[in-house]
């Protein structure tokens, strides 16, 4: 996790410094959400408030900078200054957004909890266009920034993201009803 901006980069050199050049500046909102989810789970199990604090920052980055204002979906990548790098949206980051939001809601209360729950609802809304396909049970994987969903085969690797998001939402919300 970057000590300056609190975000997680995608590419590193062998000594864990950011990879040189443009590649070393890339941050994916989907991975900010995914690592927020991992850290809040680990932090809550271990009683590690620092991990939960870092999880909240990763989530904040994903939510504040990684959501396309027009389409309301998490995009593919940002630069380390949080400017847009690639506005393509894929299905899997929406699931990670949902997982992180509901897990963070589970370790917070009051207005903060309500904010994470509202964000989870936004993540569900972001999933909807990807699931609105002519063939029930399939999904669109990619939504370019400047055109409709790509009509291409649905990758099977996306299915576990969908199932895990459903499981996480159900598990967390069932305990906290």
Where are these predicted regions, by residue range?
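Glycan-recognition and catalytic cores of secretory/periplasmic carbohydrate-active enzymes
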Residues: 1-177
């Amino acid at each position: 996790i970057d000590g300056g901006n609190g975000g997680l980069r995608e590419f590193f050199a062998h000594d864990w410094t950011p990879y040189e050049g443009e590649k070393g500046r890339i941050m994916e909102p989907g991975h900010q959400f995914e690592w927020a989810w991992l850290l809040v789970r680990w932090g809550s199990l271990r009683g590690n408030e620092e991990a939960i604090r870092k999880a909240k920052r990763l989530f904040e980055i994903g939510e504040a900078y990684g959501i396309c204002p027009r389409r309301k979906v998490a995009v593919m990548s940002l630069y380390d200054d949080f400017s847009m790098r690639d506005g393509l949206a894929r299905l899997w980051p929406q699931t990670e957004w949902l997982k992180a939001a509901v897990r963070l809601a589970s370790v917070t209360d009051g207005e903060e909890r309500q904010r994470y729950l509202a964000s989870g609802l936004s993540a569900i809304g972001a999933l909807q266009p990807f699931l609105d396909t002519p063939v029930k049970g399939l999904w669109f994987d990619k939504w370019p920034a400047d055109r409709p969903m790509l009509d291409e085969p649905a990758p099977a690797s996306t299915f576990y993201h969908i199932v895990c998001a459903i499981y996480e939402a159900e598990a967390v919300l069932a305990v906290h009803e």
